[in-house]
UniProtKB/Swiss-Prot annotation:
InterPro entries: Enolase, Enolase-like_C_sf, Enolase-like_N, Enolase_C, Enolase_CS, Enolase_N
Free-text function comment from the UniProt entry: Catalyzes the reversible conversion of 2-phosphoglycerate (2-PG) into phosphoenolpyruvate (PEP). It is essential for the degradation of carbohydrates via glycolysis.
Official protein name in the record: Enolase
Family matches, as SUPFAM superfamilies: Enolase C-terminal domain-like, Enolase N-terminal domain-like
UniProt EC number: 4.2.1.11
Binding site for (2R)-2-phosphoglycerate: Q163, K337, R366, S367, K388
Gene name of the record: eno
Organism: Rhodospirillum centenum (strain ATCC 51521 / SW)
Pfam families cross-referenced by the UniProt entry: Enolase_C (PF00113), Enolase_N (PF03952)
GO molecular function, one term: phosphopyruvate hydratase activity
Amino acid sequence: MSAIIDIHAREILDSRGNPTVEVEVRLESGAFGRAAVPSGASTGAHEAVELRDGDKARYGGKGVLRAVESVNGEIFDTLSGLEATEQVAIDSIMIELDGTPNKNRLGANAILGVSLAVAKAAADELDQPLYRYVGGTNARTLPVPMMNIINGGAHADNPIDIQEFMVMPVGAETCADSIRMGAEIFHALKKKLKDAGHNTAVGDEGGFAPNLKSTDEALGFIMKAVEAAGYRPGEDVLLALDAASTEFYRNGRYELAGEGKSLDAAGMVAYWQDLVGRYPIVSVEDGMAEDDWDGWKALTDAIGGSVQLVGDDLFVTNPTRLSEGISRGIANSILVKVNQIGSLTETLEAVRIAQSNGYTAVMSHRSGETEDSTIADLAVATNCGQIKTGSLSRSDRIAKYNQLIRIEEGLGRARIFPGRAALKRG
């Protein structure tokens, strides 16, 4: 009864007003699954390929009708009649059908949309929540959120070089409480910024995007907001940063234009050592550029013993690149974005490799999101303990937090909220 009888894709809009792919899968039993594919702004060069139309007369070339056609044509013809519960086989068939190393023929956006919608349909068939279907009976760890409350870099039109300034409410007793704490800090920050004469417009991920002069100024405002909300920085609330360093890496140097600094790899490592020494920063994502492996090694050797060093553009949720990084002793954590690799099976494999090698994993959104809340379920399914899904505004971000609240309620007394322990590596 779990045989696939229909797969239908359409072009919808994401949170930035750009087209993306939505896929619906229907099974013989009547079970149904729907998934929408996210899209990034600061994308890694090694990511799977999002298939765009390139027709400048339509959505500025960003249309996804070719990807939609891939789903409604070749992919449906190939998967029709197969059992939706055979996720690994279905994903493998689509990858083989595409026939390229980076999914550029059918499009990672096409393959991922089908992959996630199939999983949702199978969960519906078995009358299980998605996190339980994917993760089994042991899926019960709620993630600590990394909440991006000040946006810079490619996510905002301001001078700040660092892309994301995040708070982690580790002192909460439940996931719902951590979300409440984050919301209180968010509103306290808004007041602090307004009182100082700064604008409180928000960036792509719902965080504020004020015209601040430096990383220090941004961190200073966040520290004051945490205290104004009644919490202790370094105890109740920890800080995390996403540098997206590849975005300002030019000719072997890190060009921090907003701060007027031009640093070599050693200088960039020293920059991070200074910051983590002065603020309760426990996690730095993409602290070095995606292909600066020597720089990454130096950073890991310098602060990796005490700071979570997350590879996003570095690893692009790719099991092969992650395995190489592990063998070279680079970073100690992976950011997990389903659309970077383009299938549920490969995403879960990346998390498995990370966790089995003592690396942490952080489930993540993209800057271009939809109301789809799949990543909330995947965070719980993988027991990864951390999630990055934006600030406390914009419904495309809040949808994930609300789903976590529902999941926690459904788990009842079985739920685990790790708090600070989420940062501990195996």
